A protein has these predicted regions:
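Terminal amphipathic alpha-helical/low-complexity segments used for targeting or macromolecular assembly
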Residues: 1-63
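Structural signal for interior beta-strand "rungs" in well-ordered beta-sheet cores
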Residues: 60-148
């Protein structure tokens, strides 16, 4: 429950479009997708993988957000305009991370084992960023994709 409170606070702090905690709780799909993932992840860890994947699939249908239930997500997370977000099974997202839309933390085709990126605390990942493989980003930085 602390993660839910922390996520609500951080959305209000970092997103100028958020007019209240209630507004976020009821309407912000990034917040809702993150909380749904927290439920699915708990089920995944309990071995209730079919139910966890069912929740993930429903979240994908509703919000166009694909966070594998095996992925680990820290607290104080902001998922802003989160359409097109994809996070693989072995990905890890640290605390105080902000992620914008159309972002991928994916693998490179490896069938098993550790195959997804690890994002450290305090990272901002801009829209359209694609990070593949077992790359570890362990310090505060801003990742940006620039299109010309």
């Amino acid at each position: 429950m602390d993660s839910v409170k922390d996520d609500l606070k951080v959305v209000k702090e970092r997103d100028p479009a958020c007019i209240s905690h209630v507004h976020c709780f009821l309407n912000f799909k990034g917040f809702l997708a993150c909380q749904s993932h927290r439920v699915a992840h708990k089920l995944w860890l309990q071995g209730r993988k079919a139910l966890a994947v069912m929740i993930q699939n429903r979240v994908f249908e509703i919000f166009a957000v694909g966070i594998h239930p095996g992925a680990k997500i820290g607290s104080r997370i902001l998922l802003d305009h989160v359409t097109g977000l994809v996070v693989g099974e072995t990905a890890v997202i640290g605390n105080n991370v902000s992620i914008l839309h159309s972002m991928t933390l994916g693998g490179t085709g490896k069938a098993s084992g550790d195959r997804n990126p690890k994002i450290g605390d305090g990272v901002l990942i801009d829209a359209g960023t694609c990070i593949l493989g077992t790359l570890r980003l362990v310090f505060v930085l801003r990742l940006v994709l620039v299109l010309w």
